[in-house]
Amino acid sequence: MFSKTIVLLARPGLSDKGKILINPHSALMMNITMPTWCVFDDTVDCEDSAENFAKLYALDILGYDVAIGYPMDNRSRLEFYRLGDVSTSTVDNDAPFVWGMPTFLAPLHPDAGNTLYQHPAMTNFLDRTMAIFASPDDSTCVGTIVGTGEHVSLQEFCEGKQRFVKQAGGKGFSQIINFPQKSDVIDVIFENLEYFSGYYLPTLNVQSVVHPIWETRFFVVNNTIITSSGRIVSEFPKFGNNASGRYGIKQFSDGLHDDNATENPYFDIMFNYAQHIVDNMSATGESLHYVLDVAIHDDDDINTVGTPFVVETNGLSNSGLYGCDIMALAEAYALDQCDHPDVTIGGLRSIDSNVMR
């Protein structure tokens, strides 16, 4: 099926843990709690394995996210790359393990700080305000407004506003907060927030709140939209005047390939918007693989209802592949690898981001 090795591997999506058969050749079983990638060399019947794994994990196991394995030249053994600290595992071969952040999750460029939103091509599409606070020296720490470069104090940005606070480098913490007008109270809120969340203030960013009603994840391989994971209907359970910030996901289906899925009246608008962004990103000249989450506004105070906006961007290597055409994605990725034999370790030129709802 593929001219070079590629294997699809599952990870638990709705549960915290799961046992997954990874390699039938060695009957390798292990507990997986974070994304894991598997690499086969051509010596391991790679074409048959790739096709079988694709069908097994993409089509038969429900409730799992799927990650893509990739080819490595001059290798004859399994290799695994993990995100996070997986405490225990059992293997029956001498496969090496790399703990922590894999090397293929490199920044787009040296100054990007592993965040796509700082890239000029993406900044133009962020239509909400986000402040990144770089110093916790005192309660008046200065943040930078993304897109304008304007400096702002914590109090100025939050006084009397509803803000979304999240961990900048991941998904470990997020909360919507209604801030009062009093600066001294805002100071206390952030002091408590840092203490109870366990996250150092520089690892948090503060954003204006958006209420999306439809969301679609577009999967991009080599600057081309290959498939999508849409139409996600987002509902915010209300508590008084506040949104909980949690999505009620009603449906997953591939808007690019499902002819019967017509429920999303905004899909064409969202796709054209995503394509416009992808075209701008392709001007970097890099072969980029990433996911782009696009949603529709439900708040005239932010923008006209029906206006698309960027919710989140992530590298393809650490994204949930919910509901997309996994075979189309795998095939596109395999073809890209054949077209770019000069790719170094990991073979996956990825971009990462902390732009989130």
Model-flagged regions — what are they?
Residues 218-220, 227, 302-322:
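A short beta-strand motif that forms the metal-chelation/ATP-contact edge
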Residues 7-28, 38-58, 71-236, 240-275:
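Active-site nucleotide/adenylate-binding loops and adjacent lid/helix of ATP-dependent enzymes
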Residues 169, 208-210, 296-298, 314-317:
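Short, flexible loop/turn elements at secondary-structure junctions
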Residues 1, 209-212, 284-288:
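A short catalytic or substrate-binding loop motif that flags glycine-/basic-rich loops and adjacent residues
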Residues 199, 236-305, 334-343, 347-357:
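A long amphipathic alpha-helix within ATP-dependent nucleotide-binding catalytic cores
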Residues 1, 29-30:
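Universal eukaryotic N-terminal targeting presequences
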Residues 326-334:
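C-terminal helical cap(s) of enzyme catalytic domains, especially alpha/beta-barrels
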